Curated annotation (Swiss-Prot):
Something else known: This is a SET 5a protein.
Function statement: LEA proteins are late embryonic proteins abundant in higher plant seed embryos. There are two subsets of LEA proteins (5a and 5b), the first ones are expressed when the cotyledon weight reach 80 mg and the second set are expressed above 100 mg. The function of those proteins is not known.
GO cellular component terms given for this protein: nucleus
Classification via Gene3D superfamilies: Apolipoprotein
Protein name: Late embryogenesis abundant protein D-7
SUPFAM superfamilies: Apolipoprotein A-I (SSF58113)
Homology family: Belongs to the LEA type 4 family.
Ranges of compositional bias, category Basic and acidic residues: 11-58
Region spans: Disordered: 1-108, 117-136
Residue ranges the record marks as coiled coil: none
Organism for this UniProt entry: Gossypium hirsutum (Upland cotton)
InterPro entries xref list: LEA1/2/D7/KIN2
UniProt KW keywords: Repeat
Amino acid sequence: MASHEQSYKAGRAEGRAHEKGEQMKESMKEKAEAAKQKTMETAEAAKQKTMETAEAAKQKTRGAAETTNDKTKQTAGAARGKAEETKETSGGILQQAGEKVRNAAQGATDAVKHTFGMADADEDEHNYPATVTRKD
């Protein structure tokens, strides 16, 4: 009878061991599923954070580009205005210089005419009033 009882105890022990193995197997499955879920959540959070960071960088770059564009337009406008002002100023200076050269040339011409006696009496009187002698 001892062998029957031993067989019974061995069967019970085997059943408990099998049950314990199944419990451990189920527990491992649950833990693996939980780890898988946690990994997926972490990956999704990382993906979301990456997208947010990329969008923020994109917005910042867009803002910087707009600011640069605005500053470039302002600088170009100021340069355009300064160029117009310089053009007007230099045009006036060139005109004045041209008039001075023309007047100097006219004065030289009149002096040469007067020196060689080629000037009319009216020209002499107009250009050299103190030196003209009238014959009345």
